[in-house]
From Swiss-Prot:
Residues 446-475, 498-537 are annotated as: Disordered. Its main location: cytoplasm. It holds the Pfam family Glyco_hydro_18. This is Oviduct-specific glycoprotein. The lineage of its organism: Eukaryota, Metazoa, Chordata, Craniata, Vertebrata. It comes from Bos taurus. Glycans are attached at residue 399. GO terms for cellular component: extracellular region; transport vesicle. The gene is OVGP1. Disulfide bonds join 23-48. Residues 1-18 form the signal peptide. It is found in: Cytoplasmic vesicle, Secretory vesicle. Keywords: Cytoplasmic vesicle, Disulfide bond, Fertilization, Glycoprotein, Signal. Residues 19-382 form the GH18 domain.
């Protein structure tokens, strides 16, 4: 019996059956009202393989906490979760939609600026006990970022990776992890990234395969459909296969799954199907307070009074009530996406975010974190499951893993102002968070601010095997964790090809240039030309 179990574990390791489950937690989530407020201590440390804290900021080309309270309260609570799960990895993410591109561009523009940033990253991560850095740059070469940032971003990744390796050798500690969140829109991907090089330099890549449709459009569409429809190739499957066809190892690609939905205000209540005419966003949610956006726990309240429908070709649900329409994910659609990830041998899933799931189980009646638990059961804790994967019926060729990296035909032209809302409901929430200047913890362990009454989060008690539980909660069960090797990625001399240049309308694109430089000696001049510069690490 032991021999059989050992053989199964070996097969599991080699066939890629173990997956990452990377989950974001936002530093503005505590400022939401009442039962929607959450702190790091409320997270289940056994639910995800990696937890990512969003977001850090930047000042004078150095990474810094976004708010003083992050450093004093939230960072310690976040990393203390590893005391309960020794296999858990934590990362700090920098960027986001509200962060913009100007500070990234300035930092990337010279080797000395990048060197200053890299040094500050290592110091901050080690000081607070994080295991790695996540870059959430939206987007290199777009939204005011110059075209050369497509390349200087690659230079930064190479310099971060080499510095992380050097620091690990000097300190005899595991190497810091390096990841990035990238667009799932092929238009953005072609202009913003050197995909093959990102695949070499990053430990994993989170594809933002959501916000594919929303209230910025004139007809209803799903936020994150699994599969594409004729005439509309945008889907999670297409985004993942597009990145794979660009040369990124599939085991490094994580499918982004949203724990929220996008809403529309219908033109006519009687026309409520997919691609029905719409005139902007539906009403803001009670807790997230952003038009066109609902957290999953808000959706649970909405669907009780609404009519639900299933999009057969896209494997996702939507609901409508009167003139309000929402496309969202539930446990069933998350299950289909998990099976797709396994079948296509991708590296796992990324969740945006833990704090938008029904984290206490108050709203949906299916227990805490119902959506993320579905992914955990299917991707992380699926040790010896014999459950057969469902069969998918592809509606168009773009859903196939055999697609090429050519541009799909789409009706929307890409501009530097992408014409979409900030991903994941960041816009309103971050501004709210920045107003909380004097958050304190009371002697009873409650959070108090000048605009809020203290909120009690329950008294944690010791449980068997070093875990904790709160009154009324089920004991946590340890799940498998995918170990991350501290070894680095071999990076030799890098051949850089600029590929398609971004040119103004009416001008012809120049011939793609090739620049060959030894690893670690790259910089960029103000006009975008690559030159060499000796590393000073």
């Amino acid at each position: 019996l032991l021999l059989c179990v050992g053989l199964l574990l070996v097969l599991k390791h080699h066939d890629g059956a173990a997956h990452k489950l990377v989950c974001y937690f936002t530093n503005w989530a505590f400022s939401r009202p009442g039962p929607a407020s959450i702190l790091p201590r409320d997270l289940d440390p056994f639910l995800c393989t990696h937890l990512v804290f969003a977001f850090a900021s930047m000042s004078n080309n150095q990474i810094v906490p976004k708010d003083p309270q992050d450093e004093k309260i939230l960072y310690p609570e976040f990393n203390k979760l590893k005391e309960r799960n020794r296999g858990l990895k934590t990362l700090l993410s920098i960027g986001g939609w509200n962060f913009g591109t100007v500070r990234f561009t300035t930092m990337l523009s010279t080797f000395s600026n990048r060197e200053r940033f890299v040094s500050s990253v290592i110091a901050l991560l080690r000081t607070h006990g994080f295991d790695g850095l996540d870059l959430f740059f939206l987007y290199p070469g777009l939204r005011g970022s110059p075209a050369r940032d497509r390349w200087t971003f690659v230079f930064l990744l190479e310099e971060l990776l080499q510095a992380f390796k050097n620091e690990a050798q000097l300190t005899m500690r595991p190497r810091l992890l390096l990841s990035a969140a990238v667009s799932g829109d092929p238009h953005v991907v072609q202009k913003a990234y050197e995909a093959r090089l990102l695949g070499r330099l990053l430990d994993f890549i989170s594809v933002l395969s959501y916000d594919l449709h929303g209230s910025w459009e004139k007809v209803t569409g799903h936020n994150s459909p699994l599969f594409s429809l004729p005439g509309d190739p945008k889907s999670s499957a297409y985004a993942m296969n597009y990145w794979r066809q660009l040369g990124v190892p599939p085991e490094k690609l994580l499918m982004g799954l949203p724990t929220y939905g996008r809403t529309f205000h219908l033109l006519k209540a009687s026309q409520n199907e997919l691609r029905a005419q719409a005139v902007g966003p539906a009403s803001p949610g009670k807790y997230t307070k952003q038009a066109g956006f609902l957290a999953y726990y808000e959706i649970c309240c909405f669907v009780r009074r609404a009519k639900k429908r299933w999009i057969n070709d896209q494997y996702v649900p939507y609901a409508f009530k009167g003139k309000e329409w929402v496309g969202y994910d539930d446990a069933i659609s998350f299950g289909y996406k998990a099976f797709f990830i396994k079948r296509e041998h991708f590296g796992g899933a990324m969740v945006w975010t833990l704090d938008l799931d029904d984290f206490r189980g108050y709203f949906c009646g299916t227990g805490p974190f119902p959506l993320v638990h579905t992914l955990n059961n299917l991707l992380v804790n699926d040790e010896f499951s014999s459950t057969p994967s469902p069969k998918f019926w592809f509606s168009t060729a773009v859903n196939s893993s055999r697609i090429g990296p050519e541009m799909p035909t789409m009706t929307r032209d890409l501009t530097t102002g992408l014409g979409i809302l900030p991903p994941g409901g960041e816009a309103v929430a971050t501004e709210t968070h920045r107003k909380s200047e004097t958050m304190t913890i009371t002697p009873k362990g409650e959070i108090a601010t000048p605009t809020r009454t203290p909120l009690s989060f329950g008294r944690h008690t010791a449980a068997p095997e070093g875990k904790t539980e709160s009154p009324g909660e089920k004991p946590l069960t340890t799940v498998g964790h995918l170990a991350v090797s501290p070894g680095g990625i071999a990076v030799g001399p890098v051949r850089l090809q600029t590929g398609q240049k971004v040119t103004p309308p009416g001008r012809k694109a120049g011939v793609p240039e090739k620049v060959t430089t030894p690893s670690g000696k790259m910089t960029v001049t103000p006009d975008g030309r690559a030159e060499t510069l000796e590393r000073r690490l």
